[in-house]
Amino acid sequence: MRRGLLFFGLFLISLVIIYMEPIWSYQISPNDGQELPLQSPPPTSLNLESIPTQGTAQWIGQPMKAFSTLYGEAQSVTDSGFGFFRHQFRMDADAFMEVTTINQRITSIKVLGETPMDIGPFKYQMSLEELTTYTVISPIVSVEYGGETYSLELMEDDINYRPLVAFDNGSYAILFFDHQDKRSGLYSLMYLDTETLLKLAPYVLTEGQPQFFVAEKAADWITIDEQKSETSRYLMQQLRRSYDFPAYSTSLALQRETQALLTDFLINQEDYLSTERLRSYQRIQRQELNQNWVLTNQEVRTLVEELDEEKTFAHFEMPVYDPIFTLLSWYSNPYLVSRLFYDESEAIGVAFSKENMLVLFQEINQPTESSEQP
């Protein structure tokens, strides 16, 4: 009897060893991170490791005055309404830079095109494979803020289109990749501090309490919303040109129509949303969750049903605290790219109401005389 039990026990142990061996080997294998095709996940590490600080990353946390002394004054400085200011530098038709500050300290820098900023060790149009020669991309990011530990998780699309890099001065960079044939590779970067990273929430928060930007009650929201609309149209035109697509047509009539549609949606949400969807919107509006909320395809059709549905497409998103960051995310979003890379002539309207953003796209046969390029 004892021999039988001993034999049975040894048999079970052998089965466990045989079954678990490939799993243990997988966990400790040093060769897991192999280079994969461009749109497959690149080599990853379980935890994000920082790289030496260089280039633009050195400016995060520094005084805006020192930055302006070296690079000149911004063409415009505007209030975001969410506790930070936006300093915009429009170099030429192909270059754009925006610096955000809190109390005159730099919290983020976004660069697009050939600006004076040093983006080393990165370079424009580099591939994900090239990025892995400088750092190993991690799906798990742990950060310290306010004495607390926060964990972020990057999904597959994040790793392919918006990977995160950490520098040893405590700053970060979101790298925006485009996988279209016309211009494949890195096309824009956003350098930012920990607070901005947590509040913009570009990745899933898996540990720690969500952090939020708070709308300022005393802010001049009419002016702020108009400024954000103009900036968004400007950047969308710039990105449009970079792909050699026809410039968007814009008109005061379409802009007013977009604003009126956004206002109607915010006032009469029960006409457009189911009870469940309305509750989900309200939860995010009350800042119970820190994640993006967008209209579904069916909700978009309901929203634009009084317009020419065959020629009109709408995209609504909230919360949008930083329009430039949001737009850069759209252009590296595999689900929005079919609309943004539509190569026929279109008119656009862009409207804001605090953290709510609506964009209307309307097909047109040819540019009209009212076309402009804000």
Task: List the predicted regions and their residue ranges.
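Hydrophobic membrane-insertion alpha-helices, especially the h-region
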Residues: 4-22
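Short helix/turn-capping signatures at newly exposed starts of structured segments
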Residues: 18-248, 263
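Charged/polar, solvent-exposed surface patches and flexible loops
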Residues: 69, 133, 234, 238, ...
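A well-ordered secondary-structure block
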Residues: 115-118, 122-170, 282-371
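Intrinsically disordered, low-complexity repeat and linker tracts
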Residues: 210-216, 367-374
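Short, well-ordered surface patches within globular domains
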Residues: 222-292, 296, 336-337, 344-348
